[in-house]
UniProtKB/Swiss-Prot annotation:
Domain of life: Viruses
Organism name: Equine herpesvirus 2 (strain 86/87) (EHV-2)
Short name of any one Pfam family annotated for the protein: Herpes_UL87
Protein name (record): Gene 24 protein
InterPro entries recorded: Herpes_UL87_C (IPR004285)
Ranges where the record places region Disordered: 102-125
Phylogenetic lineage: Viruses, Duplodnaviria, Heunggongvirae, Peploviricota, Herviviricetes
Amino acid sequence: MASPSSLLFGEAVILPVYDLDAQQQQRCAKGGRMEARELLSLQIDIFSCLALNRSLGGVTANLDALDAALRPEPIFYTCRAVRRLLLGACWYPVVVENEEGEGEGEREVDEAAAKEEPGNNRIGTVPGEAYEGAGLIITSDGMYINKKIQTHSYLHTIYSLESTDNAREEWRCRARAVFCHSLSLTLINPQLMFRIISRYLSINQFEECFSSFVEGVARDRALRATCTRNYFALLGHLKSPAPPLYSPPASSARAHELHAHGVLSFVADWPDLEALAPLRAKIAENLVAFPQTLASLCALPYCREVSLEAEGFHENQALVSMAMPYLKVAVYKKDPGARPGRVVAREGGGVERWYVYPPRMAVYRITMCLAAMGPGARHVPSEAPRPSSEGPGLPHALVSLLNRGKYAPRETRATMTLPLGLREGALFEPGERRRPLADSFAPVSSLSVHGFGINVFNTNMVINTKIACDPRGARYRTVMDIPRLTNNFVIRKYSVKEPSFTVSVFYSDAACASGTAINMNISGDYLSFLYAVGNLKCFMPVRTVFPISVANWNSTLDLQGLENQQLVRRGRSDVFWTTNFPSAVSTQRGSNVSWFKAATATISKVHGPGLVARVYSETAPILTNPRARLNLVKNAIFSTVETRNKAQIQTIHKRFLECLYECASFGRLDVRAVLRLARGGYFDFSKRIISHTKNKHECAVLGYKKCNLIPKILCDKKKVRLDELGRNANFMTFLSSVAHRNRKLKNRMLRHISRTMGLSWKLHLHKN
């Protein structure tokens, strides 16, 4: 052992790693062993070096000093320590010399020095196999990196791939290693490290830190496996939790505090809605006003029935059910029979209703019963005896557990091995990320099918939800203003131009108290939906909007660059024709794809990853057909224009670009110049211009008559509709319908197509 300069013990040292061979750890493990001193102060000091790159004093380190050091950016520093812990230990070859200059790398570790106090300034090395190569030399003057050393001693260090490492350019190494004095005195204790991490990160932040780091090193399989193994080493002590201890009986005050905490925690998880605020306040008041009722409800087994005589229980339950639709509460007007979690509510006039709460949700039933208590309410006590404050003793509890074991299900061959194996993939899948909002409100989904770009546009969404209205809303001035039921109990229908959406309001006999159902049809992203809900409050007395559910998605795509567009509807066994709509419908796995003219499709019912998979399975057979003629340059041009403008290309824009491309090809010019212009934004457009919009409100700027003339052109004193052959018709599709009188020009076009597509297309064009 030697005592280098004191600078080594104040800051963490970043070392270059030249040898990434897997045998490095084996060379050390075969020859020597390091003592596992699990002192908390040393573990805190190691964590500080990994997070802050500096020591807190070794054995004098404590949690207060660590809190003060991490206070500026606790999440950033802790995540840096987590990433280094995931990379694992690195045994760094070293030669330590004493003050007289004698090398210590060739000697065994002094057993007496290993038992010294960890606070002294001595570096503990671990003996191993002989090593020759790049390594570290520590002398009384400092530390040096040498490309050629001979040693069999190793330092305990930690790998690091941080971009914030103060690495020198002349090192030219991929990885680094972090070393501090405490690492030479003890091994890393994963359990203590996880406890320190939990002090600054939640479990969700810890999982997110791990997932983002693993995705960054996904290409290196060995490194990813090492990170996953160290991740489960940090969580290893959680696989076999300690058995629960028998809790002694608590006093009535402590029991009431525990029960009240459970109710308040459940109420705190409710959605933050204005309509639930009075109910929250009433529950908090009744926790203090009715302690005996709370104790009786908590002592009642869940299989027993609760009887109440209170007003307003039905309204409270309907309000909470709308706010939390995933917790289903069944309501009956007749006795449903023996079911657990039942509540019988008797209101004025002798009206009785039975409520059956979901299993293992006793706190839900207790909370709603407590909310109904008031001056005139009364809780009918059950026949179950109230437990005493003392409770059963430990011998009675053990006998009860043994008796319950007699009737437990017997072991089978599948469950005979204990403890059950833990499947690591079930806890965490780094490659999967759930993005429900981004998938539900994605305006454009781009994918590549065998190198062919396709953009899928979200046409519209049908959203169902409930709203609670202000009872002081507008009154009807006359009897004639009262809305009449029209279609499917729709009493009102609103159409809004900006943002474009429609709202249908359904009939409800208690719209102010229990809410009414609405149906919203909207297209756009999540911000457009929030904007639409804000506009809804301008013409309706909306007090609360309850959780929504998207009932249907409609998406549209165009196969840009497919020259023979009739291929999508010909010669397919999975396509049948509809009678009332001009489209061919392909149905697979319960979802329909309607193919219109000019290779345009509409998909319903699916979104997100399901939509991408459905489009891929539908378009792959078409694009891989031997008869398909694909123009990848056109596909790149139109995909670029669609991606830049986040909208489908309309008829006039489509025909202009098609003719521009064919003119360049006809003149034997560089057709990729059109692609470069598209990428430069020269063909960008707005959905609000008259030639692209479908909204009459926007077309009315120039007048209705001019709006109708937009999709038509004057050809030989005759009006011709541009979209007659389809909005997405390409040059090959509309070529046969133009230039009937100019035979010379048409023959030149046919020769051009034969030159670009092949001689087999000449006969095909003459037939058309």
